[in-house]
């Protein structure tokens, strides 16, 4: 029975592939209904993983509608090292993430993975056609875009980084100068082997309340006026308030519910009252 089932699955996937090649528009209609089951197959049907990788589709920063991994690869820049993606949230939130701009500015396409299963399945895939699939909200993804100038800015920012880390304590794993922010003062990422903050939130909502707490890494933009002003401040209460707002607004920007929304508003109001 198992061999019959396997043969049937392979034949069905072959028909899907034929449809995707012969009638892409009709296949896109099909994918709106069956993209998720195909993605689930990546996790549960290893023998057909290569075929499934050709069949699944994603949204992208470069075009409307869906794209395949194969089409993404064809559009890659010659100096591009990885297939970049961002998962964990609805499409609108992901597209507005401050993490995306640095990659777009360098001409790197980012796949928008707005299905909650993406954050679970895609990390298990690892590579497509020998190219690494890299989440841009992981700490190591910045290595692909970091410049020597960024490294110099990081050295110069050490005093303000320490201020923020001392203020936030164990709410963050570390505070680092960002190479991927231009307009925003801060963003959050996670260590390579840690689940994203969005995944942690999703798993807890599903009832897995005994998960260990993985703290995020806070990245700050050394060129942003808020960070430059913070570097000049000695008022410990103000430093604490600004640091908390920098973290909480970074979480909110990624669609994450903050633990103390009332405290966030109070600290934001305190900052406004002292600066206006």
Where do the model's predicted regions map?
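Conserved GHKL (Bergerat-fold) ATPase module
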Residues: 1-276
């Amino acid at each position: 029975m198992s061999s019959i089932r396997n043969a049937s699955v392979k034949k069905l996937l072959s028909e899907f592939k034929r449809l995707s090649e012969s009638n892409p528009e009709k296949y896109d209609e099909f994918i709106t209904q069956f993209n998720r089951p195909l993605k689930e197959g990546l996790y549960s049907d290893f023998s057909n993983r290569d075929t499934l990788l050709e069949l699944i589709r994603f949204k992208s920063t470069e075009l409307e509608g869906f794209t395949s991994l194969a089409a993404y690869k064809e559009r890659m820049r010659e100096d591009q090292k990885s297939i970049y993606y961002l998962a964990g949230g609805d499409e609108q939130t992901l597209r507005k993430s401050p993490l995306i701009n640095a990659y777009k500015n360098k001409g790197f396409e980012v796949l928008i993975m707005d299905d909650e299963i993406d954050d679970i399945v895609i990390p298990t895939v690892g590579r497509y056609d020998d190219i690494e699939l890299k989440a841009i909200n992981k700490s190591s993804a910045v290595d692909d875009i970091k410049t020597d100038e960024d490294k110099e800015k990081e050295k110069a920012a050490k005093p303000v980084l320490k201020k923020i880390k001392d203020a936030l304590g164990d709410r963050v794993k570390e505070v680092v100068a960002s190479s991927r922010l231009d307009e925003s003062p801060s963003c959050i990422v996670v260590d390579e082997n840690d689940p994203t903050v969005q995944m942690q939130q999703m798993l807890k909502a599903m009832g897995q309340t005994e998960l260990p707490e993985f703290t995020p890494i806070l990245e700050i933009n050394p060129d942003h006026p808020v960070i430059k002003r913070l570097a000049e401040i000695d008022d410990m209460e103000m430093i604490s308030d600004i640091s908390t707002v920098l973290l909480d607004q970074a979480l909110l920007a990624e669609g994450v519910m903050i633990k103390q929304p009332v405290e966030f508003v109070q600290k934001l109001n305190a900052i406004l009252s002292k600066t206006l």
